[in-house]
Amino acid sequence: MTLGRDAMTPLTILSVSETIYHNLLTSMVQDIVSRTTSRQQLQDARYPGLAPLHHDQRGALDVYGRPKPQEASVYFRCPNCSRDLSANRFAAHLERCMSRGARRG
């Protein structure tokens, strides 16, 4: 009879599969940690003074920690029909406008 990790535990399919699973998980976690650490060290070497992005729970500040602009009169021109649209409606208009053009042709 062959023994497992402990001298008292007999080698079974369950014990072998648990050992393989444990080794696989450990290897995956170590790989992820190693890659993340390497990326962070490379980023720190390339950009030594890089400040992390700011996260505001209230939503009043942008990712750089500055107050969000309250100007709602930002307009974009539709490349399909050349209409000027407000920024908050641009994506919805573009979806409708582009699908309308595809149906015509």
From Swiss-Prot:
One Gene Ontology molecular-function label: transcription coactivator activity
Entry-linked InterPro entries: SAGA_su_Sgf11 (IPR013246), Sgf11_N (IPR041216)
Protein source organism: Eremothecium gossypii (strain ATCC 10895 / CBS 109.51 / FGSC 9923 / NRRL Y-1056)
Subcellular location: Nucleus
Name used for this protein in its record: SAGA-associated factor 11
Zinc finger (SGF11-type): 76-97
Recorded GO CC terms: DUBm complex; SAGA complex; SLIK (SAGA-like) complex
Primary role: Functions as a component of the transcription regulatory histone acetylation (HAT) complex SAGA. At the promoters, SAGA is required for recruitment of the basal transcription machinery. It influences RNA polymerase II transcriptional activity through different activities such as TBP interaction and promoter selectivity, interaction with transcription activators, and chromatin modification through histone acetylation and deubiquitination. SAGA acetylates nucleosomal histone H3 to some extent (to form H3K9ac, H3K14ac, H3K18ac and H3K23ac).
Family statement: Belongs to the SGF11 family.
UniProt lineage: Eukaryota, Fungi, Dikarya, Ascomycota, Saccharomycotina
Subunit structure of this chain's protein: Component of the 1.8 MDa SAGA transcription coactivator-HAT complex. SAGA is built of 5 distinct domains with specialized functions. Within the SAGA complex, SUS1, SGF11, SGF73 and UBP8 form an additional subcomplex of SAGA called the DUB module (deubiquitination module). Interacts directly with SGF73, SUS1 and UBP8.
Principal subcellular localization: nucleus
Keyword field: Activator, Chromatin regulator, Metal-binding, Nucleus, Transcription, Transcription regulation, Zinc, Zinc-finger
PANTHER family: SAGA-ASSOCIATED FACTOR 11
Pfam families in alphabetical order: Sgf11, Sgf11_N
Domain notes for this protein: The long N-terminal helix forms part of the 'assembly lobe' of the SAGA deubiquitination module. The C-terminal SGF11-type zinc-finger domain together with the C-terminal catalytic domain of UBP8 forms the 'catalytic lobe' of the SAGA deubiquitination module.
GO biological process: chromatin organization; regulation of transcription by RNA polymerase II
